[in-house]
């Protein structure tokens, strides 16, 4: 079982003994227990285990008790804190002073004791000390004996906790570059200062010859390889598609069989490089058994590798998927072309949702007029205002087929613990593995092809690095859509019929970047996007504010935005205030 950070609950209280404190002990501790129960009952880690909470041993009224609580949280592996109170407390004495923990304070809205007054006072202290905290204050007054958590308060607590757990989970992990810069793509020029200062992560790197060395020297689990090949023969190789290469570039059957064996070994080795494998230690490879402690990774592929060896499409697709030959499991985060910036966006989405993430080129905006000109047909329904073609060289998660279904029977991408074996088989059945286009991939290999089902709510994200400014985040909520099959066939074949397609329509609004579908495409900051199931823009914005990464483009309603209270001091324009606050506070780990 993986070890995850915990969320610390800090019940603060009026320190005046002799009647005041005593009358509040039970109430304050009950609120803390209610918050812990809310989080544990509603939030899970990537492996499906509940997010754990640690409550201080007692209420916190004076600074010595704050210190004792801090010591306990360090021992217990806490990564974020929520302070809870129903009354006045001594702000600077009782506040969380850890500079690395995301922090929130819930001040109970009641009349008998001034929890709201403490909330305002301690948030002023957090702002004054440069330790931003999220303020949580219920809209409606509650009675003193009411220990329930109102819906608006619960929503903010869970939004904070979800993002805070993501921050804490990233801290101390690695991003593994397998290879280096791919085709001059800026996102694959990995910036270690960003990872260290903003995410608390380190960067690891291997030359791609390490994969060949492990193949040649047998540094992989042979039993697992045999199991993996049998599974691949049953579920993937049987769905091998037509070879569209010209005869001179078409591989023989024997060569294709060798490619299948190669890419399966490659997948096992890439996973071992990320997380290690105790089986390798049993085989005598102690160093290789350790792995790189990578929570995300990227594979360069093009061009040096793919000009000579089978491409990484199968390996990337399977690792990004919530299942493989070992069964249903948490998806990994692996980027095509070692695009670390997109990898970070994928990681954000994965940690916030516990779901597999789609990696795609933001390839083409198709206007209704262009579609009519090319196909003679009109886009209809949700696609009527134009569509964005999300497509990449076969490396997209197979969860992206949309063959999983939610409780309402709608297409979905689900956390691994909700996926059924039947849904796994449907995802595999919906995927064709085409021999790689050898104009692009001279070394061969296989690329996945599928068409995502329409009707899934999704959020497309991208992290970009801007010289002189730093990291910025883009967010576009929308939906996958289905279009007339004849239109799809014509548009797909003039792009690349061996790669997977997701047709995307963003939700439009009165913001300039979202006035129409074209504007979303035109304002996108790079060639790739990370697509997560669900409308999670508000959670991404909360996470970005914790990491001090401004959001330059989003279509989230303003009343859904939840950032630290200190952001209110930077002006009434929310986007401008976000930039000013992020610049003022700077990265957490600098």
Curated annotation (Swiss-Prot):
EC number: 5.3.1.25
Primary location recorded for the protein, binned into one broad class: cytoplasm
Top-level taxon of the source organism: Bacteria
Catalytic activity: L-fucose = L-fuculose
GO cellular component: cytoplasm
Binding of Mn(2+), residues: 337, 361, 528
Family in the record: Belongs to the L-fucose isomerase family.
HAMAP family associated with the record: Fucose_iso
Protein name per its UniProtKB record: L-fucose isomerase
